[in-house]
UniProtKB/Swiss-Prot annotation:
Subcellular location: Cell inner membrane
SMART domains xrefs: Haemolytic
Organism whose genome encodes this protein: Francisella tularensis subsp. holarctica (strain LVS)
Recorded GO CC terms: plasma membrane
Pfam families per the UniProt record, alphabetical: YidD
Signal peptide limits: none
Topological category with respect to the lipid bilayer: Peripheral membrane protein
Listed name of the protein: Putative membrane protein insertion efficiency factor
């Protein structure tokens, strides 16, 4: 568990760098709730690096003006076998 949190730090830092240093200077344009950066943080924390990056990439590719997807796009729950 500790190793998982340590490996997430660089990704969380990059997302926060975008959120607090870059995002304030560009107009808000995310089509979804939660925003893409919030989604990325949640996906990484819930699913880990590999699946979290996969889900984040899919989300970013869907976030464009021509998208006909629903407004709410939540991170999928983590399936637990057993």
């Amino acid at each position: 568990m500790f190793f998982k949190k340590i490996t997430l730090i660089p990704f969380v830092m990059l997302i926060n760098l975008y959120r607090y240093c870059i995002s304030p200077f560009i107009p808000a344009r995310c089509r979804y709730y939660p925003t893409c950066s919030e989604y990325a943080l949640e996906a990484l924390k819930t699913h880990g690096i590999l699946k979290g990056l996969y889900l984040t990439t899919r989300r970013l590719l869907r976030c464009h003006p021509l998208s006909k997807r629903d407004y709410y796009d939540l991170v999928p729950c983590k399936n637990k076998k057993g």
